[in-house]
Each structure stands twice: as C-alpha cells, then as structure tokens.
Amino acid sequence: MAKQVVKKIKLQILAGKANPAPPVGPALGQAQVNIPSFCSQFNEATKDQANYLVTAVISVYNDRSFTFIIKTPPASSLLKKAANIKLGSANSNKNKVATIKFDQIKEIATLKMPDLNAYTLESACKIIEGTARNMGIIVEK
C-alpha cells in the first residue's frame, strides 16, 4: 500500500536558515512532522542559495514522514535584490523606486524558468517585467 499524502504545506524560508521557531515550527508541528529533521534536511539542501527566500512545498504522509520540493526564490525578492531596494512602491503607477536593465530581467527569467508558466525565455521575461512594473521598478531596454 502506498503512502497517502495527508497534508501539503507551503512555506517561504530563508535558504540555509530554517529553525524550529515560527513560521516553520508551528506549521510542521500541526502536521506532526519531525521538525529538527526537516530543518537539517532543508538547510543542507539550500546551503548553496544562502540569503535567498525560497519556497518549500512539504508533503506530509499518513505515517508522519515527509518529502519536500524547493522552488526558486520569488520573482519579487530577486527583483528587490537586483535593484538594491528593501520594498517595492506602494503606489507603482505614480512612485517609481528603482531602475534595472533588461539584462537583469533576462537573468532573473532564466533562473525562474522552471517555475514559470512560460515556454520561451521571451515570455518569461515579459512575466518578470510585469512583476517589476507592479513593484514600481522601471526596466531599461
């Protein structure tokens, strides 16, 4: 008999810095997952992506075991890092907070390609450009 997935948990955690404190501890504790085991496995798997916010999708099975998939960092956090800003604009139509080059958009789109709903790099760039526009970041061609 195959293991059944009882719960799916989606968390955004700094790569290499998972610990039992919130938000990790309470989310996994409710699903009765071995928290120290998850933290050590997650930190080992993400040690090369230091200081990036990554999304972990955790599947919890009926025997309390788990597996997890690590997705690429959110586009907004990659754009903030590329533009050297802490936050995007609250009113992106009027207030522009930064300017980045199209080459940086292309680099981010290449990194995000596996997680985006796009088949070509050109369409992935358009998705990332739209995110940048909504954050108040100007893209120079």
Swiss-Prot record:
SUPFAM superfamilies: Ribosomal L11/L12e N-terminal domain, Ribosomal protein L11, C-terminal domain. Transmembrane segments: none annotated. The keyword rRNA-binding applies. Pfam families: Ribosomal_L11, Ribosomal_L11_N. Keywords: Methylation, Ribonucleoprotein, Ribosomal protein, RNA-binding, rRNA-binding. The keyword Secreted does not apply. GO terms for biological process: translation. GO terms for cellular component: cytosolic large ribosomal subunit. It comes from the Bacteria. One or more lysine residues are methylated. One of its GO terms (molecular function) is structural constituent of ribosome. Belongs to the universal ribosomal protein uL11 family. HAMAP family: Ribosomal_uL11. Forms part of the ribosomal stalk which helps the ribosome interact with GTP-bound translation factors. Part of the ribosomal stalk of the 50S ribosomal subunit. Interacts with L10 and the large rRNA to form the base of the stalk. L10 forms an elongated spine to which L12 dimers bind in a sequential fashion forming a multimeric L10(L12)X complex. This is Large ribosomal subunit protein uL11. It comes from Phytoplasma mali (strain AT).
